[in-house]
Amino acid sequence: MKPGIHPEYAEITANCTCGNVIKVNSTVGKDLHLDVCGACHPFYTGTQKVVDTGGRIDKFNKRFGMLGKK
């Protein structure tokens, strides 16, 4: 490999909203904030949970909710 052309590879922490902290190696260089990780994702935990980012479900129901009602 050629010296001096590859990005820096450092250890960063990825913090999830559930409190899980994951240490990974990355070229990003700064810590990450995750909404969902493997410890709290509904597919892996077997529980149903609605993940609503920014009220998108409410916004959709407000716009198109009347179409389904007769």
Swiss-Prot record:
Annotated GO molecular function terms are: metal ion binding; rRNA binding; structural constituent of ribosome
Question: Could you tell me the superkingdom of the organism this chain comes from?
Answer: Bacteria
- Please name the GO terms of the biological process aspect recorded for this protein, alphabetically: translation
Q: Which residues cross the membrane?
A: none
Q: Which GO terms describe its cellular component?
A: ribonucleoprotein complex; ribosome
One Pfam family from the record? Ribosomal_L31
Q: Which cofactor does it need?
A: Zn(2+)
List the keywords (alphabetical).
Metal-binding, Ribonucleoprotein, Ribosomal protein, RNA-binding, rRNA-binding, Zinc
Residues the entry annotates as binding Zn(2+): 16, 18, 37, 40
* Cofactor remark: Binds 1 zinc ion per subunit.
Q: Does the keyword Ribosomal protein apply?
A: yes
Query: Does the entry feature the keyword Metal-binding, yes or no?
Result: yes
Q: How does it assemble?
A: Part of the 50S ribosomal subunit.
Q: What does this protein do?
A: Binds the 23S rRNA.
* Entry similarity comment: Belongs to the bacterial ribosomal protein bL31 family. Type A subfamily.
The protein's matches in PANTHER family, at most eight in alphabetical order, are given as: 50S RIBOSOMAL PROTEIN L31, CHLOROPLASTIC, LARGE RIBOSOMAL SUBUNIT PROTEIN BL31A
Know the name of this protein? Large ribosomal subunit protein bL31
Q: Which species expresses this protein natively?
A: Shewanella oneidensis (strain ATCC 700550 / JCM 31522 / CIP 106686 / LMG 19005 / NCIMB 14063 / MR-1)
Q: Which gene encodes it?
A: rpmE
